[in-house]
Regions:
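Helical hinge/lid and interdomain linker segments adjacent to catalytic or ligand-binding clefts
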Residues: 25, 31-33, 38-125
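Catalytic beta-strand/loop cores that center a nucleophilic Ser/Cys/Thr
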Residues: 148-235
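A glycine-rich, often tryptophan-bearing local segment used as a flexible ligand/cofactor-contacting loop or short
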Residues: 33, 96-170
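Extracytoplasmic/secreted proteins, especially bacterial periplasmic and envelope-associated proteins
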Residues: 48, 52, 101, 105, ...
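Extracellular ligand-binding/catalytic regions of CAZymes and related secreted enzymes
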Residues: 25-28, 34, 52-55, 200-202, ...
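Sec/Tat signal peptide C-region and signal peptidase I cleavage site
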Residues: 19-24
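Bacterial N-terminal signal peptides
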Residues: 6-18
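Positively charged n-region of N-terminal signal peptides that target proteins for export
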Residues: 1-5
Length: 284
């Protein structure tokens, strides 16, 4: 057999595998975990919300991203987050938050620099180990008795210096916007991405659960509250908290949707283009 033919074939094979290895290393992996159904139609649509985010990320980023969506609760396989650049949790929280019994599993990923984003109810965990973990990993959490969860219209005040806001149009959206998070002491290392000023009706607790009022919330009338925030951790990973997305139809708002998609991509370590992640408006 011609030695030159063998040599050329060998070089071609090495080149092929090298190309695919480089390509694989260029792909950013994002894992979504969607919680079990807990509300009526249109609210806490965790499965639908994660699938929408997945499809719109692929629309905007194409082969730059690999996505996995685990539906209806915490994944049961042994190593669900292998090689993930970001984990996005969109699920019911509080005492029944799945992260409470899976802290070590998540910590293993965090310690290697994996990003973590918690959305809506997923920012709520009990005081103690889970609360401290979220403060470390994403900068803060919803603390029962301290935070509040009313339904109100937020008029966006965006931190235009942050990449998550790139290309995002200002918006006015009614949602169950949680606020007064229990952030790290002095809000150390926490960057506000989206703020808004709740009206006094929102602060009254009439639409929150449990019903208000809470003295410290009412007395802060007129104060802007942080609804989306970010951290860049010492381990190299990133964290984001986003308190909206109670109502699925809010993904139909261009500014709201782009902010969320930018946040997911930023959490995974991707560079956000100046116009943000551009996708079509879904019919919801």
């Amino acid at each position: 057999m011609n030695i030159n033919f063998i040599l050329c074939s060998f070089i071609a094979t090495i080149s092929f595998f090298s190309h695919n290895l480089v390509h694989a290393n260029d792909v950013t992996k994002i894992v979504f975990v969607a919680g079990n159904r807990s509300h009526g139609w249109g609210a806490h649509e965790f499965n639908a919300g994660c699938m929408l985010m997945e499809s719109h990320l692929k629309e905007a980023l194409g082969e730059k991203v690999e996505t996995v969506v685990y539906k209806n609760g915490w994944p049961k396989n042994q190593d669900p987050f292998v090689d993930a650049d970001a984990i996005v949790l969109f699920m019911d929280g509080g005492g029944g938050h799945p992260i409470n019994r899976n802290l070590e599993q998540v910590k293993k990923e965090i310690d290697r620099g994996c990003g973590l984003m918690c959305m809506h109810y997923a920012v709520e965990v009990p005081v103690g180990n889970s609360g401290k973990a979220l403060q470390n990993w994403i900068g803060g959490y919803y603390e029962t008795g301290w935070s509040i969860n009313p339904h109100w219209i937020a008029e966006s005040k965006l931190n235009r210096k942050h990449p998550i806001t790139f290309g995002v149009e200002d918006f006015k959206v009614k949602d169950e916007w949680y606020f007064n998070m229990r952030f790290r002491q002095g809000k150390e290392g926490v960057t506000s991405v989206l703020d808004a000023v709740p009206d006094d009706n929102a602060r009254s607790g009439r639409s929150s659960w449990p019903r208000g009022p809470k003295k410290h919330i009412v007395e802060a009338s007129g104060r802007a509250e942080t609804l989306c925030w970010s951290v860049e951790r010492n381990d190299g990973g990133r964290g984001v908290g986003f308190t909206g997305a109670h109502f699925h139809y809010n993904f139909g708002n261009d500014g709201f949707r782009k902010l969320v998609l930018n946040a997911v991509a930023w959490t995974a370590g991707l560079e956000i283009p100046k116009n943000g992640l551009v996708t079509h408006r879904p019919c919801l």
